[in-house]
From Swiss-Prot:
InterPro entries cross-referenced by the UniProt entry: N-reg_PII, N-reg_PII-like_a/b, N-reg_PII/ATP_PRibTrfase_C, N-reg_PII_CS, N-reg_PII_urydylation_site
GO biological process, one term: nitrogen fixation
Protein known as: Nitrogen regulatory protein P-II
Residue numbers carrying O-UMP-tyrosine: 51
Family according to the record: Belongs to the P(II) protein family.
Gene: glnB
CC annotations in GO: cytosol
Functional note: In nitrogen-limiting conditions, when the ratio of Gln to 2-ketoglutarate decreases, P-II is uridylylated to P-II-UMP. P-II-UMP allows the deadenylation of glutamine synthetase (GS), thus activating the enzyme. Conversely, in nitrogen excess P-II is deuridylated and promotes the adenylation of GS. P-II indirectly controls the transcription of the GS gene (glnA). P-II prevents NR-II-catalyzed conversion of NR-I to NR-I-phosphate, the transcriptional activator of glnA. When P-II is uridylylated to P-II-UMP, these events are reversed.
């Protein structure tokens, strides 16, 4: 099993969610996040003063899946989240040793 964490632009969430559903992903966890990468943020004007906004709004998606779905899920996220502009995001893939469904006690792939 693997866990995919994707940091994307907030307005791309619906497209990514739909793309993941189409490849067979049944559930995701979404967290609002703030961060910056190479784009370093931007400046804004407020009441005549200039402010540097370091952290940009992002959305973090977390999905755990069987190894057989990983490549298709990565491709789906890439295609759905892509704008071609700086700040499109990142995808991280890590191994998952165990999953346990709290309600039933199911483990492994049955618990996903």
């Amino acid at each position: 099993m693997k866990k995919i964490e994707a940091i994307i632009k907030p307005f791309k969430l619906d497209e990514v969610k739909e793309a993941l559903h189409e490849v067979g992903i049944k559930g995701i966890t979404v967290t609002e996040a703030k961060g910056f990468g190479r784009q370093k943020g931007h400046t804004e004007l407020y009441r005549g003063a200039e402010y540097v906004v370091d952290f940009l709004p992002k959305v973090k998606i977390e999905v755990v899946m069987e190894d057989s779905l990983v490549e298709r899920a990565i491709e789906a996220i890439q295609q759905a989240a892509h704008t071609g502009r700086i700040g499109d995001g990142k995808i991280f893939v890590t191994p998952v040793e165990e999953v346990v469904r709290i309600r039933t006690g199911e483990k492994g792939g049955d618990a996903i």
